[in-house]
Regions:
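Conserved acetyl-CoA pyrophosphate-binding loop and the N-cap/start of the following alpha-helix
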Residues: 52, 56-64
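Conserved active-site tyrosine of GNAT-family acetyltransferases
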Residues: 88, 93
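C-terminal "cap" of GNAT-fold acetyltransferases
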Residues: 75, 79-84, 98-124
């Protein structure tokens, strides 16, 4: 799997490719539009095409965004998720709050970037 980055100052867009075809994306963003928690930066927009899910692409993208945040001097990274709490927990993320966003129970999660990652084999 190859990763391609578009660096936009404090933000980064990553694209994962397999056999030359895009299979996933993820962003490092300075802020999230909603719901509103006053923290930064954010892992946002993680998406893997269905036929490449559960093959490790999501974990590779998350780890790459974590590395990008570390390189920019951040000690923590945040995200919102409605359905993938267990996935992120396997990667070392922790739920710190819940909010109701448009009728969905949404978890605010944090990753302490000074801590090593969780078991990568269980993350896929």
């Amino acid at each position: 799997m190859e990763l391609f980055a578009s660096d936009q100052g404090r933000g980064v867009a990553l694209v994962a490719k397999a056999d030359g075809e895009p299979v996933g994306t993820c962003l490092l963003a300075e802020s999230e539009i909603e719901p509103n928690h006053d923290v930064s930066p954010w892992l946002a927009g993680l998406f893997v095409v269905p036929e490449h899910r559960r093959k490790g692409a999501g974990a590779v993208l998350v780890r790459a965004i974590e590395d990008q945040a570390r390189q920019r001097g951040f000690s923590r990274l945040y995200l919102y998720t409605t359905e993938a709490v267990e996935f992120y927990a396997r990667l070392g993320w922790t739920v710190v709050d819940h909010t109701n966003w448009k009728g969905f129970d949404t978890a605010l999660m944090v990753r302490d970037l000074s801590q090593p990652g969780a078991d990568k084999e269980n993350a896929a």
